[in-house]
């Protein structure tokens, strides 16, 4: 939660720093930065402050009564919650080049079919997606929000590129590699966005402010 602290690290501060790192590695020209509420807002504010690009609310949450839309086990329930809780502000979106920050891309289904669609439907000129965490490669071993490797957006991309399942996609973990770039471009095309750039894992660790050996990195590295 934004007002929480873990191991002495402010959640909101870490989110803003993640957004700032995204901005420092970016060179996109845009009219404004926006966040997918609620968890993407802190990242977007950090991006806006670091880049000098103004922050605007392209999407607003209908009510704080809706919970995290990616956690229900059934896809139809996840889609329903996501549809009901987000409203697009057309007067802000129409005709503009938008950088949209979210906390992560898990499956990519809600981002593609709901969030991105709402932005295009309301007249976005360009959509540049900036997830404030690295590509998720492995299901979480502590929660049930993701249960299988195959449901993750990155693994769907790898399966499409390789024509088969890969047990440990080591070549795709290196964000400097050609295979990593092809994976990101596959996801970009699948999402139907102008550009897609993830936060690098080293930048995420630096933004959090704790040593890597004190963080669980299983979702990204598988260890």
Language model features: what each stretch is:
Residues 1-223:
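PRPP-associated nucleotide enzymes
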């Amino acid at each position: 939660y934004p007002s929480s602290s873990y191991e002495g690290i402010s959640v909101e501060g870490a989110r803003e720093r993640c957004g700032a790192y995204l901005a420092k590695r970016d060179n996109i020209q845009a009219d404004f930065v926006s966040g997918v509420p609620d968890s993407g807002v802190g990242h977007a504010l950090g991006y806006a402050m670091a880049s000098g690009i103004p922050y605007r609310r392209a999407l607003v949450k209908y009510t704080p009564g809706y919970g995290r839309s990616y956690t229900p086990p059934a896809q139809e329930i996840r889609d329903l919650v996501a549809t009901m809780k987000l409203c697009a502000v057309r007067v802000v979106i129409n005709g503009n080049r938008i950088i949209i920050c979210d906390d992560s891309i898990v499956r990519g289904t809600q981002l593609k079919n709901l969030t991105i669609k709402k932005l295009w439907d309301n007249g976005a000129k360009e959509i540049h997606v900036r997830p404030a965490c690295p590509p998720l490669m492995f299901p979480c071993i502590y929660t049930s929000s993701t249960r299988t490797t195959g449901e993750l957006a990155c693994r769907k991309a790898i399966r499409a590129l390789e024509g088969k399942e890969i047990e440990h996609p080591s070549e795709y973990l290196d964000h400097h590699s050609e295979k990593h770039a092809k994976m990101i471009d596959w996801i970009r095309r699948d999402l139907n966005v102008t550009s897609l750039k993830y936060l690098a894992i080293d930048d995420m660790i630096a933004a959090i402010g704790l040593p890597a050996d004190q963080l669980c990195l299983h979702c990204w590295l598988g260890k």
